[in-house]
Curated annotation (Swiss-Prot):
<dbReference type="GO" id="GO:0051539">
    <property type="term" value="F:4 iron, 4 sulfur cluster binding"/>
</dbReference>
<dbReference type="InterPro" id="IPR002684">
    <property type="entry name" value="Biotin_synth/BioAB"/>
</dbReference>
<keyword id="KW-0093">Biotin biosynthesis</keyword>
<keyword id="KW-0004">4Fe-4S</keyword>
<dbReference type="InterPro" id="IPR010722">
    <property type="entry name" value="BATS_dom"/>
</dbReference>
<dbReference type="GO" id="GO:0009102">
    <property type="term" value="P:biotin biosynthetic process"/>
</dbReference>
<keyword id="KW-0949">S-adenosyl-L-methionine</keyword>
<feature type="binding site">
    <location>
        <position position="100"/>
    </location>
    <ligand>
        <name>[2Fe-2S] cluster</name>
    </ligand>
</feature>
<comment type="function">
    <text>Catalyzes the conversion of dethiobiotin (DTB) to biotin by the insertion of a sulfur atom into dethiobiotin via a radical-based mechanism.</text>
</comment>
<keyword id="KW-0479">Metal-binding</keyword>
<dbReference type="Pfam" id="PF06968">
    <property type="entry name" value="BATS"/>
</dbReference>
<comment type="similarity">
    <text>Belongs to the radical SAM superfamily. Biotin synthase family.</text>
</comment>
<feature type="binding site">
    <location>
        <position position="131"/>
    </location>
    <ligand>
        <name>[2Fe-2S] cluster</name>
    </ligand>
</feature>
<comment type="pathway">
    <text>Cofactor biosynthesis; biotin biosynthesis; biotin from 7,8-diaminononanoate: step 2/2.</text>
</comment>
<dbReference type="GO" id="GO:0005506">
    <property type="term" value="F:iron ion binding"/>
</dbReference>
<feature type="domain" description="Radical SAM core">
    <location>
        <begin position="41"/>
        <end position="268"/>
    </location>
</feature>
<keyword id="KW-0408">Iron</keyword>
Length: 354
């Protein structure tokens, strides 16, 4: 019998009560649910590529890609498909099972849709799951991407409805919810989460997760981002969030959305190994892999695999993309895990069974 129920009617008071639990109680509850649903030692790996960088007309205060802020970012045109495919091949060789493509747009133009759908088809033909984040989508655009075979669409809610206006004024909260509805209606999977550490209050972190958990269907993937402060953006000097509050956010997300993948997303470059380990225990089971997330730093692949080996974690090897035996970094980590398990006479670390 399951120790949890999948709900869509969480009150703010209930969510805030979870945040207020003693840390040990919160982690125990979150990890128990996580272990019941997922392999607790398996982490899904995604690679994120910026296919069009900078010059975004929006005013999101956290974003270095906004044309409104002087961050020194050089804008780039939409990448050629062959360049995207080269990056996708490298991602697959490094162990990624999902390839995410992001463009700094308010919304895609109709003239770009044939190009984008061709891009999806080509990447998907490699055996990778595909994801895009292109801004707001109309119902028609969502259907076009779905027909091309796009698996996931990312569109974050960013924060609570109450704090949202302090961060963004060029797009409403309802605009974001409408895009998520269009994505779901088209038959694609939803990737939606938010950013913490933007100067919000604890009740705003609760409000963000409440909104996500009370969607008609929970997001399939929930990225939790720690703000990466970029010089030139309005949030470049905001106070740092207590790392333990970040862990609490991961844990509450796992409790509220037990069947979703919770992604430890932006900000990992500045997180200690110990903090990341706590997040994995709290229920995070997905990461972005590679040295860059759109325009901000991310841990090197070798660093991630070293951490995986030390924690006894293994990359997910799902139906979409099986890591080839000669994929250097992941294969080496898997062999080391397996060797350590054999040395202890018990299969403590590596188990390739799905």
């Amino acid at each position: 019998m399951s120790s949890f129920a999948v709900r869509h009617d969480w009150s703010r008071q209930e969510v805030e009560a979870l945040f207020a639990l003693p840390m040990n109680d919160l982690l125990f509850r979150a990890h128990s649910i996580h272990r019941e649903v997922f392999d607790p030692n398996e982490v899904q790996i995604s690679r994120l590529l910026s296919i069009k960088t900078g010059a975004c007309p929006e005013d999101c205060k956290y974003c270095p890609q906004s044309a409104r802020y002087d961050t020194g970012l050089e804008k780039e045109r939409l990448l050629e498909i062959e360049k995207v495919l080269t990056e996708a091949r490298a991602a697959k060789d490094a162990g990624a099972t999902r390839f995410c493509m992001g463009a700094a747009w308010r919304n895609p133009h109709e003239r770009d849709m044939p190009y984008l759908t061709d891009m999806v088809k080509e990447v998907k033909s490699m055996g990778l799951e595909t994801c895009m984040t292109l801004g707001m989508l109309s119902a028609h655009q969502a259907n076009q991407l779905a027909e091309a075979g796009l698996d996931y669409y990312n569109h974050n809610l960013d924060t609570s409805p109450e704090f949202y206006g302090d961060i963004i004024t060029t797009r409403t909260y309802q605009d974001r919810l409408d895009t998520l509805s269009n994505v779901r209606a088209a038959g694609m999977k939803v990737c939606s989460g938010g950013i913490v550490g933007m100067g919000e209050q604890a009740t705003d972190r609760a409000g963000l997760l409440q909104q996500l958990a009370n969607l008609e269907q929970h997001p399939d993937s929930v990225p939790i981002n720690m703000l990466v402060k970029v010089t030139g953006t309005p949030l470049d000097s905001v106070d740092d969030l207590d790392p333990l509050e970040f862990v609490r956010t991961i844990a509450v997300a796992r409790i509220l959305m037990p069947l979703s993948r919770v992604r430890l997303s932006a900000g990992r470059e500045n997180m200690s190994d110990e903090l990341q380990a706590m997040c994995f225990f709290a229920g995070a089971n997905s990461i972005f892999y590679g040295c860059k997330l759109l325009t901000t730093p991310n841990p090197e692949e070798n660093d991630d695999m070293s951490l995986f080996r030390r924690l006894g974690l293994k990359p997910e090897q799902g139906k979409a993309a099986i890591v080839e035996e000669d994929a250097a970094v992941v294969a080496r980590a898997a062999r080391e895990q397996q060797a350590e398990g054999e040395a202890k006479t018990k299969p403590l670390f590596y188990d390739a069974a799905n």
